Amino acid sequence: MLFRERLWPSAGILLAASLSLPMLLLAALPFGTQVGFTVAILGTLSLFGLLFITSPTISVDKHLKVGRMRIPLTVLASAEEIEREALRDLIGPKADARAQLFIRGYIKTAVKIQISDPLDPTPYVVISTRRPKELAVALLANRS
């Protein structure tokens, strides 16, 4: 494995998820205090578990694997680090409708990967990552 990163939820996402505790408590309190606290705690813990279990992984060996996407390194033309401001434009007004995007809103940096496969209409892939330089280096160093 040349590169591996798990895209864990950010502190902000976890803070927002923790707000489900008082909401669940208020919703379940009419059924009794014990039931209310049990539902609130179990519901919030379940939400945290779901957030961590469903966190996607980026890995690079002979293929780039992100979620269900799998791309052979041999069809990658280039990989470049994208910062916050450029990322906003790239996935917004300057986006190509044929591009593949794997974006997490709580991760502010990404890598843009040009695809050189003549059989694939996808011009590029944009992947959110907290370690864009390392991912770009791993992709470019192992293309052949």
Predicted regions and their residues:
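Conserved beta-hairpin
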Residues: 42-80
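Cytosol-/stroma-facing membrane-proximal "stalk/adaptor" domains immediately downstream
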Residues: 130-144
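Hydrophobic, well-ordered secondary-structure segments
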Residues: 18-20, 44-45, 56, 112-116
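Pocket-edge structural micro-motifs
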Residues: 5, 115, 129
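Short, aromatic-rich membrane-interface segments at the entry and exit
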Residues: 31-40
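N-terminal membrane-targeting/pre-transmembrane regions
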Residues: 1-28
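Non-transmembrane, membrane-adjacent beta-strand/coil modules in membrane-associated proteins
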Residues: 68-126
